[in-house]
Regions:
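Class I S-adenosyl-L-methionine-dependent methyltransferase catalytic core
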Residues: 1-46, 51, 55-69, 74-269
Length: 269
């Protein structure tokens, strides 16, 4: 097919979403739960893409959301040209082209917290606790990691759509999780431990009105609003809490490399 033929195909095709049968989804979770995983493994990502189609409606700052870019012929022709050039093939699937939106950086997908990374961090820093509280639960990566370790997960998020999607995942996979839609900025509570990856300022948009805070400001909020024995945060940068960094996560992708900071804070008894 020619570039223009691919473009015509895209323009006549709905945005490709991920759909898997229950057997495959269960196998994905069992792999996360029972098999040893590297922290940067993509195991469990398919679960997130299946249950959270709303990720494709969200966008990186100054970029279109992938699902909106799909309907723009000028953008999609650039993506198709990019895919044909770098894949060195003249046979593309709709999913190849969708991936090209992120790889070409034209309309990249928002970030997903790897379930394998969540499992690794909980096991390393919070394993003495049976219940994990997450005030910014997002697209369920930390829920999957916690439940893969047979922990109970309590998660909340300001976005009602992602909570609805997470509840469907919980119900289908029979996960031990309590989920609710709540604004953590105006909440309080007491838990054994807290584990979250708060929004990175205004780098990503989820089509809702939220207050824009820095990572340090989010940590301040969590320490003020929630009384816990331990707090575990993954953030892109910190000035105020540098002394509490216990490790860095090095990510490599088509966008280059980045280092996320893992911050562990223990509350004095």
């Amino acid at each position: 097919m020619t570039n223009l033929e691919y473009l015509n195909l895209v323009m006549s095709t709905d945005f490709p979403l991920d759909h898997y049968d229950s057997e495959y989804l269960t196998k994905q979770f069992n792999n996360l739960k029972y098999k040893e995983q590297k922290s940067l493994s993509n195991t469990g990502i398919a679960l997130i893409k299946h249950y959270h189609p709303s990720i494709w409606r969200c966008n990186i700052k100054n970029h279109l959301a992938p699902i909106n870019a799909w309907n723009d012929p000028e953008i999609m022709l650039k993506v198709i040209n990019n895919r044909l050039k770098y894949l060195k093939t003249d046979v593309l699937s709709a999913y190849n082209i969708r991936s090209g939106l992120s790889i070409s950086k034209i309309a990249p997908k928002v970030s997903i917290f790897r379930p394998a990374m969540a499992k690794y961090l909980i096991n390393k820093y919070l394993n003495e606790f049976e219940v994990i509280f997450d005030p910014c639960c997002g697209f369920s990566g930390r829920m999957l990691g916690a439940c893969a370790l047979n922990k109970k997960y309590i998660g909340q998020d300001i976005n009602s759509i992602t909570i609805k999607e997470s509840k469907q995942m919980r119900n289908d996979l029979k996960l031990s999780a309590d989920l609710c839609c709540k604004d953590s900025l105006y909440d309080s509570g007491e838990y054994d431990c807290l584990f979250t990856c708060p929004p990175y300022s205004d780098k990503e948009t989820w089509h809702q009105d939220i207050e824009i805070l820095s990572a340090d400001e989010w940590i301040d909020v969590c320490l003020k609003n929630y009384k816990c024995k331990k707090y575990l945060f993954v953030v892109d940068k910190t000035d105020k809490y540098k002394d509490f960094i216990v490790e860095e996560i090095k990510n490599s992708s088509h966008f280059g490399t980045s280092n996320e900071k893992v911050i562990l804070i223990k509350r004095d008894s």
